[in-house]
Amino acid sequence: MCGGAKMSVTNTKWVLKERPEGLVKNENFELIKEEVRDIQDGEVLIENQYLSFDPTQRMWLTDLPGYLPPVQIDEVVRSGGIGKIIESKNGNFSEGDLVSGMIGWQTHHIPSENDLKTMRKVPDVLPIPTMLNIFGSTGITAYFGLLDVGNPQPGETVVVSGAAGATGAMVCQIAKIKGCHVIGIAGGDEKCSWLKECGVDDVIDYKNSNVAEELTKLAKDGIDIYFDNVGGPILESVLFLININARIICCGSISNYTGEQMPVGPRNLTMLIVRRAKMQGFLVLDYYGRAGEAIDDISKWAMEGKIKHREDIQEGIENCPETLNRLFTGQNQGKQMLKI
């Protein structure tokens, strides 16, 4: 900060007060204002700019086991995002640096020592929403999930559920770049039209058609790769149609995130044996060390006009709960985020 008297900074934050059931409600949380303490040696103060909203955040609000521990009562709600460093006592970061990482539902953030190690500097060369979308965890998830786990080959049939979401749309487009026939599953005319704009070969509107019947018609030669963002009955429908040596990439299970009990699994997992197929889960956290590979390729494809993207930007820290719900009501159009 500039010399002279230091101005006090007020942080506005959402903390969890009770475990939600179904869609979240404002009363599940408390919006608190508090003065930010002085930073110590080795610390930085971040002014948050944009928050990323992803379906997995809803699962973090339950007490079910996951790849990260549940958000505890009276803790700030966990969320990734991008912010600007406005004060630094750490030699690795300067005032004005843009950084991405877990910053939470709040306007300001002093990361812990461990959290600061995971913060990545963001080049100030593109709009922040673009960086948070295709060059952030969304793009990295799509890239490594499809290419590293799925290993697509030209001519193969790739099915993507949640295809109009931020990750799903990226997966569809990367699969097309790799020469695959792509079938996208989404809900509603607008989202299905968006997928056609992205070059998807065939689109299934799960809200207005029978997914199992449509898959049987469209995937006449079977399914080689399924990128699963939703779980539930759609996964079961796909399993009946997989080819020998098919690869099922388990990225998310949005259909189950608002429940309080673990869902019943697919009844036809024996198809994995019959078809000698691979079903593998993965986490983008495991690939952050290789993020440069994804960013290089995605940058090249974007410059060549092969990648389309769009963002759904809400505004105001007070609207965090409503913004999260948009992912589960189908209101979001593109990558869901919030400008603070």
Protein language model regions, located:
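Short amphipathic alpha-helix with an adjacent loop that forms part of the alpha/beta core around
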Residues: N210-D221
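NAD(P)H dinucleotide-binding glycine-rich loop of Rossmann-like/cofactor-binding domains
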Residues: V77-K84, E95-G162, K306
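N-terminal Rossmann-like NAD(P) cofactor-binding module of classical short-chain dehydrogenase/reductase
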Residues: S100, V159, I204, Y226-F227
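Glycine-rich phosphate-binding loop and adjacent beta-alpha segment
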Residues: P233-I307, I340
